[in-house]
Amino acid sequence: MKQLRLEPVVQVRGEINIPGSKSISNRALLLATLAKGTTTLTNLLDSDDIRHMLASLKQLGVGYRLSQNNTVCELTGLGGAISADTAQTLFLGNAGTAMRPLCAALTLGRGEFTLTGEPRMEERPIGDLVDALKQLGANIMYLKNEGFPPLTINATGLNGGDVEIAGDLSSQFLTALLMVAPLAKGSVNIHVKGELVSKPYIDITLALMAQFGVQVINHDYARFEILAGQQYVSPGKVLVEGDASSASYFLAAGAIKGGEVKVTGVGRLSIQGDVKFADVLEKMGADIEWGDDYIIARGAPLTAVDLDMNHIPDAAMTIATAALFAKGTTTIRNIYNWRIKETDRLAAMATELRKVGALVEEGHDYIQITPPAVLNTAEIDTYNDHRMAMCFSMMAFADCGITINDPDCTSKTFPDYFAQFASLKA
């Protein structure tokens, strides 16, 4: 197994241009596919999740051209649903942002489609989405365990009508349903059951749908109306914002050991909720400066916070490791959906934080972290989870440094993360 040793860093300073957002990249690729016209996507993320989506689209007959560095994609839309004359099997790795939307999109046309992935994907639930699609007439069959991939879709199109979908596990289910609803045979009325988690991710979806010419009537996130007869039309160009979750590590670095760190590609005008991570750092005592398309974090003594972070679940992980450098006990609440991500992130985070000496209380949907007087070095297991590897890079700011096991798992969203991180040393 590959290991990466991070030696202690005294101070950080610098500027990082954040690679494209995973959430926006895969949503935009799918909408461009369903749209009429050719779309040029710039600052597309070049990572495993996006490669799985692109490979699947190519297999389904979608035409596109990629630039040499894979960050510009010119894609010719189908002007409607995806159909196939022969049965197709698509391998989607551990890419939830490809599995969920494609599962929904492939019900719209005609054909037989089987969706598979890595072993971890077979543990990531999809039942809430499938149940909703079945209410609109979809024919979907599980191949192993009820409620989980792999699955086979026999597509004949989606009916309109009323549909209920659970909102309390993952916003990706609602996102997938919203994106396909305009191409159903009639108007669709979506009722959200339970508390909707990660609302800002729904805002990303609605903003992109509007960019492609489709309007959704949002009744305070409890009900969504999508009128029949709408069509996605390419806006011509789509600029993919920098990934706000990826920005969180560099902003935390600036807060803990700045100096001053500036991230570009996200800012005040961002459509991603995870930029609110900077507000949490500010509450902890960091000096934060906002621009339209940049955020600057400067170092200051940090103090613990006790916050509901349901709205920023991915970036909240960075707070868990930043808490090691804050005075007092930090509590991160309402984050049950950490448990159904690339790994059970609540259990994984608690285990690894204890290795470096933290006192940790792990609850059903919260984590409480009290830093030790002196942090210990350790070998951090990353659970094939890109965010675990990036979060624990913060331990480079302890006097003992840290060893990261399987550092290349960052390829899911940020292949050159550790090279960029190293560039910040003052």
UniProtKB/Swiss-Prot annotation:
Active site: 314
Complexes and interactors: Monomer.
Location(s), subcellular: Cytoplasm
InterPro entries for this protein: Enolpyruvate_Tfrase_dom, Enolpyruvate_Tfrase_sf, EPSP_synthase, EPSP_synthase_CS, RNA3'P_cycl/enolpyr_Trfase_a/b
Binding site for 3-phosphoshikimate: 22-23, 27, 170-172, 198, 314, 337, 341
Taxonomy of the source species: Bacteria, Pseudomonadati, Pseudomonadota, Gammaproteobacteria, Alteromonadales
Gene: aroA
GO BP, sorted A to Z: amino acid biosynthetic process; aromatic amino acid family biosynthetic process; chorismate biosynthetic process
Family annotation (NCBIfam families): aroA
Principal location listed in the UniProt entry: cytoplasm
The UniProt record lists the keyword Aminoacyl-tRNA synthetase: no
Name of the protein in question: 3-phosphoshikimate 1-carboxyvinyltransferase
Catalysed reactions listed for this entry: 3-phosphoshikimate + phosphoenolpyruvate = 5-O-(1-carboxyvinyl)-3-phosphoshikimate + phosphate
Annotated binding of phosphoenolpyruvate, by residue: 22, 96, 124, 172, 345, 387, 412
Stored SUPFAM superfamilies: EPT/RTPC-like
Purpose of the protein: Catalyzes the transfer of the enolpyruvyl moiety of phosphoenolpyruvate (PEP) to the 5-hydroxyl of shikimate-3-phosphate (S3P) to produce enolpyruvyl shikimate-3-phosphate and inorganic phosphate.
Pathway recorded for this protein: Metabolic intermediate biosynthesis; chorismate biosynthesis; chorismate from D-erythrose 4-phosphate and phosphoenolpyruvate: step 6/7
Entry's EC annotation: 2.5.1.19
GO MF, one annotated term: 3-phosphoshikimate 1-carboxyvinyltransferase activity
Organism: Shewanella sp. (strain MR-7)
Family statement: Belongs to the EPSP synthase family.
Keywords: Amino-acid biosynthesis, Aromatic amino acid biosynthesis, Cytoplasm, Transferase
